[in-house]
Each structure stands twice: as C-alpha cells, then as structure tokens.
Design a protein with these regions (language model features):
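S-adenosylmethionine
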Residues: 1-296
Length: 296
C-alpha cells in the first residue's frame, strides 16, 4: 500500500503517511432546517462549559462544524432530535457538489450508512423525489435509524445496483450520487486497521466493481443530468482510471465543474478528471470527486 501511495502521489506521499497516523478531528453537519452552524457551536460551548475558540470552528463546507477534540454523542445538544449529525467535512462536500441549487428526481446509490441520504433530505425542497438504494439489508437498517433520528421516513430499496430491472421504474434521475465502494485508503486515520487488512490486489477488484456500477447507473441518468462519482480512496486506479475507462465506453459524457467555494477548491488537487482532497488537508479525510454530466 505504501509503495502504491508513493507511485500515485510522488510529491505528497510523505504528508499522506503522516496524516494517516494522526488523530482525526470530529466533524459535525448541522441540520439547516433546524439551526445555523454558528448557533449550534455556541450551544455546544455553553452546555459543555468550553470557550468557542477552544472548541472548534465553522467549516468552509455549508452547515459544518469541526471540533478540535471529539466529544461524546450525549454531549452534543439536541443530537437525538436531529439537529446535528457526525460526518466528515469531505463527505459533506459530496452532497454540496450534487445539489448545487438543483433538485428533481435524485438517486443516492450505495446509500448506507445514510449520512449523505440525510444531508440530501435536509437540503432539498419537498417536491424533489429521493430514491436511496443499498445492497446490504443490515446496512440498510442503519439508514433507517439515521433518518428516523433526523425526523424523516424513507423506504430504502434493498437491491443490487447492477440489476437495474429489479429496482428502476424507468423514470430518469436528474441527479445521481454514487459513493462507490472502495479501498477506503483516504480514511485510514479513522480506521487504522485498513493498513493491515487491505491488499494491493483489492484495488483492482474495486476498480472493476466501481466501473460496473458506473456503467449500469449511467442509463438511468436523464439528458443534461448530473452524476457525482465519489470515493474515499487515494488511488488513481479507483478514481481517474475508472472515469477514463468509463468515458471510452460512452460518448455522451461531459465533465462538470465542482461548484464549491473557492477556499475549498484551491486546497483540493485537480486531477485529470476530478478533484482530490488528501487526508489532513482542511482537517478532512481523503476523498475524490468527479462531476459527470450527460450530454443532450
């Protein structure tokens, strides 16, 4: 794994390895339908008798708070009332990239454990239609639990994404979020066991799985629709290489821009087909984002 990181990131591998050994901060996503990020961090500071400056700061991604030191869930005000969720800042960016002022028919693919599903519901109008799909029944229950805490009721489809006929109603999606299964090499600081469990051969297997899902879902996207392809991987084989192979098969793929605020984008690394957040940059986990739009 280290050799592969060195190969893919010859100018950044040292900072990647250092960041993977550091303690990760605690990121929160505030529910904008219930409270603002500023008011919520004030509430945490007050209830935990900590100064706001020592507690953390408002993140650059919308409705985010980064705590310098993790605190117990029971110490998070109104957590069980759906005011806030625990979700890394980079993961929050995926939904920002997806919605960006648009709505309509939305698909959250590979939806478990439901963080992004909840974030979508917190940021769309009632007329939008969200479909969430997950192949693992046990992980689908996690989505139900997360949404129940946030005050939402949503039927989760338990299906294989590649078996399109088993779950798709033939109505095209305007927006698709594909948070693809991956090596999780960008979140090692949160899950250090990955360093010992993941093998280089796993990367090729993930590449094939990611490409298959991407090809399957493309047929369900409307003309002029937007798909955000996301992984928490650092490896080109799971990121740009997947998009490159995908483009060879489809001639109706256009690259959309990630319409994020400039302070975030200037800290991301522009790749051939997307953007990479390296672990530790902006205090976030390592994530890759590519915006794909279907040509009319």
């Amino acid at each position: 794994m280290i050799q592969k990181i060195k190969k893919d990131w010859p100018d950044h591998w040292k900072i990647i390895l250092e960041s993977n050994n550091e303690k990760a901060p605690m990121w929160l996503r505030v529910n904008p339908k219930k409270i603002t990020a500023n008011k919520y961090i004030d509430m945490i500071a007050s209830e935990n008798n900590v100064s706001k400056s020592n507690l953390g700061y408002i993140g650059d991604c919308k409705y985010s708070v980064c705590l310098k030191n993790p605190i117990q869930i029971d110490s998070l005000p109104m957590f069980y009332d759906g005011y806030v969720s625990i979700q890394d800042g980079a993961a929050q960016l995926a939904v920002e990239c997806l919605l960006n002022g648009k709505d309509g028919r939305i698909l959250d693919a590979c939806a478990a454990p439901g963080g992004k599903t909840g974030q979508i519901l917190e940021n769309i109008v009632e007329s939008s239609q969200l479909t969430a799909i997950e192949i693992d029944p046990l992980r689908a229950k996690l989505i139900d639990q997360n949404l129940e805490r946030l005050g939402y009721k949503k039927d989760i489809l338990i299906n294989d994404l590649n078996d399109i006929e088993s779950w798709w109603d033939s109505e095209f999606f305007d927006l698709i979020l594909l948070d693809a299964p991956c090596s999780s090499s960008g979140v090692i600081r949160r899950h250090p066991d990955i360093k010992h469990l993941r093998k280089v051969s796993d990367i090729s297997a993930y590449h094939k799985k990611q490409l298959k899902i991407l090809n399957s879902l493309w047929s369900t996207l409307s003309k002029n629709g937007r798909m955000i392809y996301v992984t928490c991987s650092l490896f080109r084989e799971e990121n740009d290489d997947v998009i490159n192979q995908f483009k060879k098969k489809h001639d109706n793929v256009a690259h959309g821009d990630l319409l994020l605020n400039n302070n975030i984008k200037k800290q991301m690394i522009k790749t051939e087909y997307g953007y990479q957040v390296l672990p530790g940059i902006m205090n976030m986990d390592g994530f890759y984002f590519a915006c794909l739009e279907k040509k009319n």
